[in-house]
Amino acid sequence: MRAEALFCRGRFTDAHIELERAYAQIRGNGQENMALCCDFLAWRLSLCAEVEPELTLEERREALLRQHNASWLNIWNATAAYYHALRGEPERIPELFAQHRLSAVNILAPGKPMMEMFENQVYLAQGACAKVVGRSEGLLAMCEGMHYALVALHVRVQTAAAYERLGKHTEARALLRQALSDGEPDGLVMPFVENYDGLVPLLAQEIRSDLIDRIVELGEASRQRKMRNVRPRALSALTEREFEIVRLMAQRLSNREIAERLFLTEGSVKQYVKQIYSKLHIDGDTRTKRRRLNELLEAKA
């Protein structure tokens, strides 16, 4: 998909345009697998740019449950697992990935390297770095056998980050250099950006290049964005949509303005706000409730 290729190069606006074209082409024609692939990109893009997926992950899952298709749910599980792993939210990763039960799922051979790469990202989010290192040789052999160069690039980057966190700096630098060499011809920056926090000490030791400069630029921007969007523990009971509404309320947007921003009805926003206050056990008049909500939002995660 062209949108995916543009995203991997860090061209977020162009990727967003192509993503919307892809959604427009498949809308209403039953190509659910393609729609789920688009969703996977949309959620990763939302971590890097002002892109709001049409449905929250929870809403998407509810829609898929009504269609009783296990393979579609497995794709959703993979998307949610990777997204929450990138956000550093291991507690929100779906059970299938959080408990590493992929072996219980029938995955067709062409999809297996990608699924295993997702699981690697989950292991990293859980701090299981030795697992990532231990799996890497087998995963890279699988990727080579199937000519999955992009997945192999992700695995090398993940393994470099794991080695670095384990204090194995020599091994980490060797893998990073190979990954940089693999990514440079096509300007593939996102595998590095998505693992930027674990690569910062390694990148600082490398001779600067256009590729490294771009990785650092996007990685730092991603860090700042993640810090702005971090969810305080006091708000952990909220769904993605509810937390999104809380952030917009903190910007002093009215219910009508929030509805316009999220393509909801004003009535739906009012219902969400009511649910938010109920879940957080916030009482009082409107001004008091908003002030208390802002206090919770500003609390340390």
Which residues make up each language-model segment?
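Alpha-helical repeat scaffolds
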Residues: 13-24, 51-64, 89-103, 129-140, ...
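Linker/hinge segments immediately adjacent to helix-turn-helix/homeobox DNA-binding domains
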Residues: 116-125, 129-134, 138, 144, ...
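Short helix-capping/turn signature of helix-turn-helix
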Residues: 4, 250-253, 299
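Recognition helix of helix-turn-helix DNA-binding domains
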Residues: 244, 252-291
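Alpha-solenoid helical repeat architecture
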Residues: 1-2, 10, 26-41, 64-80, ...
